[in-house]
Amino acid sequence: MDSEIKNQLQDSLGGNDDSKDDITCSSKSSPTMAASSVRERSTSPEGPPPPLPPRPNTLNLLDEGASSSRTLRQSTQSALQSRATTAVSLTDIASHDGGKESYPARGLPGTLRAKASLSHLASPRGSDTADSASVKSSVPQTDFGEVENVFSDFVATESGPMQHDSTGLLQFPEFQADDVDDDFTEEFEPVGDVGDEGENEVLENWKSKRKHYLILSAAGKPIWTRHGDGGLISTYIGVIQTIISFYEDSQDRLNSFTAGDTKFVIVAKGPLYLVAISRILESETQLKLQLEALYMQILSTLTLPSLTHLFSVRPSTDLKRPLQGSETLLSTLADSFTKGSPSTLLSALECLKIRKAHRQTINNALLKTRTNSLLYGLVVAGGRLVSVVRPRKHSLHPGDLQLIFNMVFEAEAVKAGGGESWIPVCLPGFNSSGYLYMYVSFVDLREDAGNVADDTATKEESVAVILISTDKERFFELQEMRNSFIEQLEKDGSLKIMKEAIDKGRPKTTDIVPGTVLHHFLYKSRGNVQFTMSSYEPDFSSVSRRRRLMSTYNNLHASIHSKHAHVRVHHCVSQSSTSLAWVTPVFQLYCVAGPNANRNALAHSASKIVQWVQQEEERLFIIGGAVF
C-alpha cells in the first residue's frame, strides 16, 4: 500500500529524475500534451517514431478521478443551490484566484473515495484501543446525520482548483526567490515621533517597514495605520485616495498594482478602503484575505449597521473615536499576518491534539453544566481549540473564531479583574447586525497557581473558557456555569490532560516519519476546515526563519491555486528549500525540506504524513463537537 501511494506521487512529480536547476517548478502534466508532441515528431524526415509505450496506470487513475469529480458537481449542484444559509461564506473571504465556483465537500461518490482520498491506505485500527472504533476515512460522508461538522455551513463554499481537477501543466516561468536575507527584528518596532527625532529620520523608519496596512474613508480621512500616525502618513493617504478615485470615476475598481518589488492591494468595503502594501512574498489573494480579516475586526467593534449609519449621516466622519481601544487588536492581528499565519493562509483552525475519549469527556462536561442562555461554548488551551458546544443547527465561522482568539489572547484588558471579562462582540460570520455577549475566564495551568489565571500567565500556560450568549444580563449565570465546568474538569482529570498535551507540543517531522527529509508540513482537512502542522523546532525557531517558511508556503499556495493551475501535485526548488504541495478533494498538504532533498524521498515522506493524519484524525481534529 505504501508503495502504491508513493508511486502515484512519483508519477505526479515526473518520474524518478532527481536533477533540478537552481530554481525550478514542476507539476503533473496532461497526457494529451505528450501525445501531441509525439505527433509533431512523427512528421520529421527522420522516419516513423518507435511505438508508444503503454500509458501508465496513474494517468488513468487521475483521468477517472477527474470524470468522477465532474459527475459529483452535477449531482450536488441543485442541492447546494437550494440550501439556505445566513452565514458569511468562505467564498467572500477565502476565494482563490481560480474563480467563484463552489467546491462541494459534503459528499463524494464511491469511485472517488478510494482514489482521491487514499483512504484505502489508512490502517483499519486507530492509534490505540480506546480510539480504534473512532478512526474513520477523511472523506466527508454524504450524510452527517445528527453529528454535523463544526464548520458545516462553510465547507461547501470553499473554492479552489479542484472544480476542474485537471492535470494540466502549470505554466510558471520563474519561481520567486525566498526571503533569505529578511531580518524581522526591527519590523515591529515603532517608527518614533516627529517631535523626538527629525522628520526625515522618522519617515525613513516608516519606509523601511516591509509591510503596511492602511485604513481610510472614502472621503480620504485616515482611520488606522499599523506604522506611524495620521500626521505622518496623511500625504500618502491623499495619494492613495486620488488613485482610487481616478479609477472609480472611470467606472472601474482598482484591486491591486505592483511598483518594483512592492505590491499594493486595495479592498473597498462600503465607506472604507483597506490597503495592504507589502514587500513580502505574498499573492494578491492572500493579502485580500488579510484585509478582509481586518475589516471583520472593525465590524466586531461597531457592527455593520452602525458603520453604515455613521457615514450615511456624515460622510467625513472620523472613525478614530468609535474605534478607540480597538487599535491594539488591529495591530496584533496585522502583526500575526506579517509574521506568517497558517490559519489565515489555509482559512482553517488548529486544534489541540488529545485522545478522542478525552475530548468526549470535556464535551460531556460542557453539556452537563450548560445553561439555557448559552449559544456557544469554547475551550481553548495553549491557543488551540479543545472543545466546542453549539446548537444543532448553528455552525461556527472560522473568521469569527480568529477574531475571538485575537481578542481573548491579545487584548491586555481581558485578563484584568481576576481573569474574568464580559465583552460585547459582533461576530460578522454569525450576524453582522448585532452584538453577542462573551464571558471569558482563564484557568492557570501552572502547578504553583490557583484556578484563576493572573495577567502573568502566557497563552501557552492557561486554558480559556469562552461562553457566548445573546442576552447581556446573563453574566452571573455564565459565571456559575464556568465554575461548575472547571470543577468537573478537575474531578475527571481533564485539566491535567490538557496541560500534558500543551507541554508535549506539536510533533516534529522526525517523530512522525523517522529519518525524513521534511523540516515542516501543513495539512488541512478540507471537510473539517481544520489544519494540523509539525513543530517549528529546531529549524524555524526564530521569527525571521518562520517568516521565510511562510513565504515558501505562500508561494506554494499561490502557485497551486492559480487560476491557470489545474494540478494536484506541485514541486518547487529554490536556493534555500525544496517544497511540495499536494491537493485532493479531501486534503491539502504543503511540506518543506532542505534545498538538496531527494524528490523521491520527499514524495515518500509526504505519503507517510497523509497516512499518519488519517490514523490520528479524531485526535487532531474536532469532528462534530458537542451539540444540543
Swiss-Prot record:
It is found in: Endosome, Multivesicular body membrane; Prevacuolar compartment membrane; Vacuole membrane. Residues 1-13, 80-89, 129-141 have a biased composition (Polar residues). It is a peripheral membrane protein. Residues 26-37, 57-79 have a biased composition (Low complexity). Residues 46-56 have a biased composition (Pro residues). Its main location: membrane. Residues 1-141 are annotated as: Disordered. GO terms for biological process: autophagy; protein targeting to vacuole; vesicle-mediated transport. Keywords: Autophagy, Endosome, Membrane, Protein transport, Transport, Vacuole. Pfam families: Fuz_longin_1, Fuz_longin_2, Fuz_longin_3. One of its GO terms (cellular component) is multivesicular body membrane. Belongs to the MON1/SAND family. In complex with CCZ1, is required for multiple vacuole delivery pathways including the cytoplasm to vacuole transport (Cvt), autophagy, pexophagy and endocytosis. The MON1-CCZ1 complex acts at the fusion of vesicles with the vacuole, through its regulation of the SNARE complex during the coordinated priming and docking stages of fusion, and particularly at the stage of tethering/docking. This is Vacuolar fusion protein mon1.
